[in-house]
């Protein structure tokens, strides 16, 4: 196992030397695992997100590593849905949300096949912000957000608008197969 740090924590600044180091490591690796997500400047208590983007430095890292290694796995840490323009360029995405103090142990078990990923998404991940049901009425004014979409939330909105989400509510893959019989 080898590693590299690409972005400065809680910054969107790309450090070219670190990017070059990460790409070089990825070229010579069987699998490239990239830990990514949202820093506190993008997502935290006390304010609403203005967009669903991840930091540009992380997107650049994912894009550059995917050019030199076909086996890229992204491990995401974020509090809610993010845009994933890289979804079709990587072999796997492991959504870990904000898992707490023992998250590293869980990630290791999942990445090394010691445990079976079996979670399902508790929300829909739209492809982009403008596909989100609340997009038309957000951000509202300082104190109020008008949720004018009525019953057209979740799958109803996507069905009504003919929009295919990136990952629908309940999406999740597992290594397990099930069979029912009498």
Predicted regions and their residues:
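Short, flexible loop segments at the rims of nucleotide/cofactor-binding pockets, characterized by
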Residues: 9-14, 50-53
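Short, small-residue-biased leader/transition segments that mark boundaries at the very start
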Residues: 1-8
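A short helix->loop->beta-strand "cap" motif at the edges of active sites that frequently abuts
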Residues: 67-72, 90-91
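Secreted, periplasmic, or luminal enzymes acting at the cell surface/secretory milieu
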Residues: 77-182
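An anion/phosphate-binding loop that grips the pyrophosphate of nucleotide cofactors and donors
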Residues: 29
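Extracytoplasmic/secreted envelope proteins and their assembly/folding machinery
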Residues: 19, 26, 59-62, 104-108, ...
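Glycine/threonine-rich flexible loop motifs
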Residues: 36-55
């Amino acid at each position: 196992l080898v590693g590299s740090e690409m972005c400065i924590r809680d910054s969107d600044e790309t450090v070219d030397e670190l990017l070059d180091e990460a790409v070089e490591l990825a070229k010579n690796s069987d699998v490239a695992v990239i830990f990514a997500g949202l820093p506190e400047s993008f997502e935290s208590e006390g304010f609403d997100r203005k967009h669903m983007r991840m930091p540009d430095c992380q997107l650049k890292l994912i894009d550059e590593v995917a050019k030199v290694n076909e086996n890229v796995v992204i491990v995401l840490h974020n509090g809610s849905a993010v845009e994933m323009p890289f979804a079709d360029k990587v072999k796997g995405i492991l959504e870990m949300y904000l898992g707490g103090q023992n998250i590293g142990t869980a990630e290791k078990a999942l990445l090394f096949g010691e445990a079976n990923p079996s979670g399902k998404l508790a929300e829909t991940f739209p492809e982009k912000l403008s596909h989100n049901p609340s997009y038309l009425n957000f951000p509202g004014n300082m104190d109020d957000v008008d949720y004018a979409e009525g019953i057209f939330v979740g799958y109803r909105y996507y069905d009504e608008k003919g929009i295919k989400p990136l990952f629908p509510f309940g999406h999740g893959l597992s290594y397990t197969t099930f069979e029912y019989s009498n």
